[in-house]
Amino acid sequence: MAKQIQAIRGMNDILPTQSPIWQKLETVLRETVSAYGYSEIRTPIVESTDLFKRSIGEVTDIVEKEMYTFDDRNGDSLTLRPEGTASTVRAGNEHGLLYNQEQRLWYMGPMFRHERPQKGRYRQFHQFGVEVYGIPSADIDAEVLMLSAMLWEKLGITEHVTLELNTLGDSEERAAYRDALIAFLEQHKDVLDEDSQRRMYSNPLRVLDSKNAAVQALLADAPALMDYLGEETRSHFSHLCELLEAVGIQYTINPRLVRGLDYYNRTVFEWVTSSLGSQGTVLAGGRYDGLVGQLGGKSTPAVGFAMGLERIVLLLQTLELDKDIKPAVDVYVTAMGDSCRVEAIKVAQDLRASLPNLKVMSHCGGGNFKKQMKRADKSGAAVALVIGEDELANNQVAVKYLREDKAQELVARDALATYIAELV
């Protein structure tokens, strides 16, 4: 017997029993961005490695440790995309979508990072994101946060997520703070762990995000970024907070929130949950006004966010919010005997034509009544339609309830669609 091939570690199959919750989530995402007038953009899975080195930053964990990178047959270095923002900017620059224009875009698709697989985090994962270009004001920052809040409301998880905000200032403000932070860290180098010492000069703001308890205790006395921000940055952030309060979105200001990607400036945010253990972030984003220019375009203000769908699916399952999702089948059609099979097929087709949203499965492969009812029950359908010799002769269909303790009913063939529509 040939050796069975397994999926690559960290790259998981989504099986038919798991698909309904994914489909529900994807439907909510599409409906919500549509309600805000956003347009979909689809970019390639494989991009030039240089795109991510220039956008994410060469000294980030993603570029240093996590990217799937290879040389193609022409010797070009290519990478499976680890996130969606850089590809969206590249496409916008390449096709002239961004300069002197406003664009509200969204994307959804697989991303790849070679990190340690754990619950809710995989090497291939699915990411949904929104990106807005050409609007510098705080009202668009508020809009993307309002959009994300609407997602939680539609998914029924508003009470289980909280919003954390911070502002990183512009490049000059951040540079001044960076120098002050390095000077502070140099005085306490003996307290820093190996990872923080490595980041101290290459990306010191990431030290603020350290999970080491001793480092966090030290940072309580570190210079505060807020002390290095100018009036314009403070005004932008203050206006954002006022808008969120006006629409009833609660938030917490977290001065340690810096985000793991180099391109962020001013507003940064995360939606977090305590329902998934230590890995609590379910959505993150912020403003990245310099990235379009950094990747060869004209300077363009931008803001956006991304979320990993596996994390949201896990949260929905943890909260048992996947229990009410409708099964893949509403009605299962059976035929008792060879002479009834053609009529059963016609009944199923007529129902699909009359009720486009109805999910109808026809039994195939023959079998006795017991076998067909077993298949009907396994399908998850609410009812089975039974067509036997008597039903065929009387132009009727028997409706057998699979999830309720109700007696079987006979329904006239020409009234069946109306009956089923009221039923399901």
UniProtKB/Swiss-Prot annotation:
Top EC class of this enzyme: ligase
Catalysed reaction equations from the record: tRNA(His) + L-histidine + ATP = L-histidyl-tRNA(His) + AMP + diphosphate + H(+)
InterPro entries per record: aa-tRNA-synth_II, aa-tRNA-synth_II/BPL/LPL, Anticodon-bd, Anticodon-bd_dom_sf, His-tRNA-ligase, HisRS-like_core, HisRS/HisZ, HisRS_anticodon
A Pfam family this chain is assigned to: HGTP_anticodon
Main subcellular location of this protein, as a coarse class: cytoplasm
Gene Ontology molecular function terms on file: ATP binding; histidine-tRNA ligase activity
Key words, A-Z: Aminoacyl-tRNA synthetase, ATP-binding, Cytoplasm, Ligase, Nucleotide-binding, Protein biosynthesis
Family membership noted in the UniProt record: Belongs to the class-II aminoacyl-tRNA synthetase family.
Oligomeric form and interacting partners: Homodimer.
Protein name in UniProt: Histidine--tRNA ligase
Classification lineage: Bacteria, Pseudomonadati, Pseudomonadota, Gammaproteobacteria, Alteromonadales
